[in-house]
From Swiss-Prot:
A GO CC term assigned to this protein in UniProt: anchoring junction
Biased composition (Basic residues): 338-347
Record-linked Pfam families: PX (PF00787), SH3_1 (PF00018), SH3_2 (PF07653)
Domain of life: Eukaryota
Residue numbers bearing the Phosphotyrosine modification: 25, 661
Protein name: SH3 and PX domain-containing protein 2B
Domain PX: 5-129
Assembly information from the UniProt record: Interacts with NOXO1. Interacts (via SH3 domains) with NOXA1; the interaction is direct. Interacts with ADAM15. Interacts with FASLG.
Record-stated family: Belongs to the SH3PXD2 family.
GO terms of biological process kind: adipose tissue development; bone development; cranial skeletal system development; eye development; heart development; osteoblast fate commitment; podosome assembly; positive regulation of adipose tissue development
Organism: Mus musculus (Mouse)
């Protein structure tokens, strides 16, 4: 006899709809045998369930019945969902889990994986070779066909009261949920199905979507005699006191567990489960899902089907498998100890005073998803209170600032970090580190808006330091489990007798004396359910309202929202940074990396490490060195360190000690006044936290030129008259690809920023036509006042770099960036400009490209020369510090030297 073949591989390929004998879905499975044969079989989910029960019966040890830790038999994805086999979504959802189950099954030891049950299951059957043909749609099935049970329309009910399950055979409900009714029972317990589970629920928690009540009255001649099997003390005026053994007449029945009875000439309501018909057994509380309504009971406690499968025939197994939890095995003793009183527990009464269907609740709001924050790129800080980190680290966000800087904590370190380097992920049970990919530009814009909205809603205890709100704690759901432990008449105090008390820990079960031990617990009244829920919801609303109303103010911005029209030339520019002015300034931070932090050049050149928001991505600009862009022409934001003034700075030289990088945001014209104002607002928050620029405009000059540098939203027009020149570099600046942080200034700037640090906003594209003048608002507050002096406006603070015989990388690309968005968002700019055109700007060899005109008079000092408005210069070198090496061509005696670039505009 040849050896029996074994299974080599099993692959679940897809699902397929079948209509014979009724509508259902089967799984298409490809089985490869050791003989080399490959066969296709079709199995519905219930067959897998049958196989699983056989496996658990045959291999109790491997099934984990005695020790769950020793279980090696895989779990099925879930129980059988009664009357759900015809729903495609249910079948598709289990496609992958079924495939994993089959693969795990055949990898078990041979005595399991090659046992008769497994081999027979995967053997080809006649119906696999000849699938049943579909019958005509109009043809009705014979009423005697026991398999024609699936094609039925299930009633749908809406949950009108929360319910927390008390037994494993029950399921919990939440207000607004829609359930399918599989079985209705006179006991008041209905077997229902949701998208995920099935079980028993009290009918009084449900209401038909059409408001129809399941109730029927009996004619006087049809009134039935029932015997009271448990004493009952009325808790409401319309209820009846019952004594054990009393015979009552049932006047009105319903399917909600409360019947109207007549006793001693009075009529009232009593729990149906406390009564039994004189001629038979007590009314069974719950019916099996396959039993007809109002028929005999079938105990469905939701225990493992394995417990009920022992010693039963397959037909019984098929009838009762629904509602079982396959993976949860309950010891036999636990089943035997289940008291009938729990299964006879009456449901809460429905409030008859509330019209049905009056206010069907809306579906509940889904719970908030807890989120975690991780760094998505490496960051090296250059500010005293910043924090450096690597990519992929979990951080705790302590404070979010609309300026684009967040105060975070990582283990024992904390400091300011750019929000664009941090992303949030949904918290999951698996602690696997997320795959960190930099968000796309359009995603960053959405993230910025989402973060701004989240910041407004954040609540938390009083924080240490300047406005340090903590994220809002997730809203906890109302504890519906305690709703049933109250007196069910709302605010009325009922007699708390031992026979009518409710225990919060056991749901409906009563605390009664030993003689009444088998008595079912008293049902809560329906009206009390509603009142109690309203009280709890109102209490919850009152608790949440102050929290919602006390959302923290956004961290302050340094700049005013709308700049003054004419800022004085001698405006103080070295005031210490105020702590609270930022709060006046609701800003939109969509500048990406341009917020004052240092990013290494190697990161800038890696697109996936640039979490930057820009309205139109320009890949060509990614190659431009971030440290080498000129301050006037730069149209792409700089991913550069947030510079601090050089220690060589002499406060006595000028009160306009400005940051050479922050200055760049002040010099570019904008296309329109409206956008310029918007840009000014949004970039005030992004300015440098330790340096800034303050200046005014010449009369007659218009605002709105700053947007011409795409993304630098703080920029000013070249027509704008700067109050003072930008600081020059203390030494020749290497415009190469390396970022050299500027030396830190005095100790006054070393202190921790009281507001989130800021970096220069992105530059904007230059506009050829000057509009009305828009003054640059003062950037620095009181911090600049401490060390200010009053020298001549426009006097340089730092020694300019020496002229170089070649065009460095810093000068190269400045004109290119004129029409490009750079690394930051492009507010305005010519979208149609191509990289070829930009490349022509890079090599500023022709005289036309290197000719600039002075837009204002400049008073020099011992290191610089003065010039008048209208002087024509040929730019020899553009330095990233904001100072250009130029030669005078007209309007003044010929000379060469360093001049501030914000006094120049390109000659038309």
């Amino acid at each position: 006899m040849p050896p029996r073949r074994s299974i080599v591989e099993v692959k679940v390929l897809d699902v397929q709809k079948r209509r014979v004998p009724n509508k259902h879905y089967v799984y298409i499975i490809r089985v490869t045998w050791s003989s080399g044969a490959t066969e296709a079989i079709y199995r519905r989910y219930s067959k897998f369930f049958d196989l699983q029960m056989q496996m658990l019966d045959k291999f109790p040890m491997e099934g984990g019945q005695k020790d769950p830790k020793q279980r090696i038999i895989p779990f099925l994805p879930g129980k059988i969902l009664f009357r759900r086999s015809h729903i495609r979504d249910v079948a598709v959802k289990r496609l992958i889990p079924i495939d994993e189950y089959c693969k795990a099954l055949i990898q078990l030891p041979p005595y399991i994986s090659q046992c008769d049950e497994v081999l027979q299951f995967f053997e080809t059957r006649p119906e696999d070779l000849n699938p049943p043909k579909e019958e005509h749609i109009g043809k009705k099935k014979s009423g005697n066909d026991p398999t024609s049970v699936d094609p039925m329309v299930l009633e749908q009910y809406v949950v009108v009261a929360d319910y927390q399950k008390q037994e494993s055979s029950e399921i919990s409900l939440s207000v607004g949920q829609v359930v399918d009714i599989i079985e209705k029972n006179e006991s008041g317990w209905w077997f229902v199905s949701t998208a995920e589970e099935q079980g028993w629920v009290p009918a009084t928690c449900l209401e038909g979507q059409d408001g129809v009540q399941d109730e029927f009255s009996l004619q006087p001649e049809e009134e039935e005699k029932y015997t009271v099997i448990y004493p009952y003390t009325a808790r409401d005026q319309d209820e009846m006191n019952l004594e054990r053994g009393a015979v009552v007449e049932v006047v009105q029945k319903n399917l909600e567990g409360w019947w109207k009875i007549r006793y001693q000439g009075k009529e009232g309501w009593a729990p149906a489960s406390y009564l039994k018909k004189n001629s038979g057994e007590p009314l069974p509380p719950k019916l099996g899902p396959s039993s007809p309504a109002h028929s005999g009971a079938l105990d469905l406690d939701g225990v493992s089907r394995h417990q009920n499968a022992m010693g039963r025939e397959k037909e019984l197994l098929n009838n009762q498998r629904d509602g079982r939890f396959e993976g949860r095995l309950v010891p036999d003793g636990d089943v035997k100890q289940r008291s009938p009183k729990m299964r006879q527990r009456p449901p809460p009464r429905r409030d008859m005073t509330i019209p049905r269907g009056l206010n069907l609740p809306k579906p509940p709001i889904p719970p908030q998803v807890e989120e975690e924050y991780y760094t998505i790129a490496e960051f090296q800080t250059t500010i005293p209170d910043g924090i450096s980190f690597q990519a992929g680290l979990k951080v705790e966000v302590i404070e979010k600032s609309l300026s684009g800087w967040w105060y975070i904590q990582m283990e024992d370190k904390e400091g300011w970090a750019p929000a664009t380097f941090i992303d949030k992920y949904k918290k999951t049970s698996s602690a696997s580190r997320p795959n960190f990919l930099a968000p796309l530009p359009h995603e960053m814009t959405q993230l910025r808006l989402g973060d701004a909205a989240a910041t407004e809603n954040n609540t938390g205890p009083e924080a240490v330091g300047p406005s340090r709100p903590l994220p809002e704690a997730p809203h906890g759901a109302v504890d519906s489990g305690m709703l049933w432990s109250k007196d069910w008449k709302g605010g009325k105090e009922a007699p708390r007798k031992a026979s009518s008390d409710l225990s919060a820990s056991t749901g409906y079960e009563e605390i009664s004396d030993p003689t009444q031990e088998e008595k079912p617990s008293l049902p809560p009244r329906k009206e009390s359910i509603i009142k109690s829920e309203e009280e709890l919801l109102e209490r919850e609303r009152q608790k949440m309202e102050p929290l919602r109303g006390s959302s923290p103010k956004p961290p302050g911005m340094i700049l005013p929202m709308i700049p003054a029209k004419h800022a004085p030339l001698a405006r103080d520019s070295r005031k210490p940074e105020p702590k609270l002015d930022k709060s006046k300034f609701p800003l939109r931070n969509d500048m990406g990396l341009e917020c004052g932090h240092k990013v290494l050049a190697k990161e800038v050149k890696k697109p996936n490490l640039r979490p930057i928001s820009r309205s139109k991505a320009e890949l060509s600009e990614e190659k431009v060195d971030p440290t080498s862009q000129n301050l006037f022409m730069k149209s792409r934001p700089q991913v550069r360190p947030k510079p601090t003034p050089s220690p060589k700075t002499e406060p006595a030289q000028s009160e306009d000690h400005v940051d050479i990088y922050n200055l760049r945001s002040k010099l570019r014209p904008a296309k329109s006044q409206e956008k310029a104002l918007l840009d000014g607002e949004s970039h005030h928050a992004a300015g440098s936290h330790d340096t800034a620029l303050s200046r005014s405009f010449l009369p007659g000059e218009g605002p709105g030129h700053g947007q011409d540098r795409s993304g630098r939203q703080d920029g000013l027009s070249p027509k704008e008259t700067p109050c003072r020149a930008p600081p020059r570099p203390a030494k020749t600046t290497d415009p190469g690809p390396k970022n050299v942080p500027v030396p830190v200034q005095e100790a006054t700037l070393q202190q921790r920023p009281v507001v989130p640090p800021r970096r220069p906003p992105p530059p904007k594209k230059t506009s050829s036509s000057p509009l009305s003048c828009r003054p640059l608002p003062e950037v620095r507050g009181a911090q600049r006042e401490e060390s200010r002096v009053a020298p001549a406006a426009g006097r340089a603070l730092l020694v300019p770099p020496k002229a170089k015989p070649f065009l460095s990388n810093s000068s190269v690309g400045q004109d290119d960036m004129r029409g490009k968005g750079g690394l930051g968002p492009r507010v305005t700019g010519k979208v149609g400009e191509t990289r070829e055109k930009a490349a022509s700007f890079l090599n500023a060899d022709g005289p036309k490209d290197s000719l600039y005109v002075a837009v204002a008079n400049f008073e020099g000092d011992e290191d610089t020369s003065s010039f008048q408005e209208g002087t024509v210069f040929e730019v020899r070198e553009k330095n990233s510090s904001g100072w250009w090496f130029c030669q005078v061509l007209s309007g003044a005696p010929s000379w060469e030297g360093w001049i501030p670039s914000n006094y120049l505009r390109k000659k038309p």
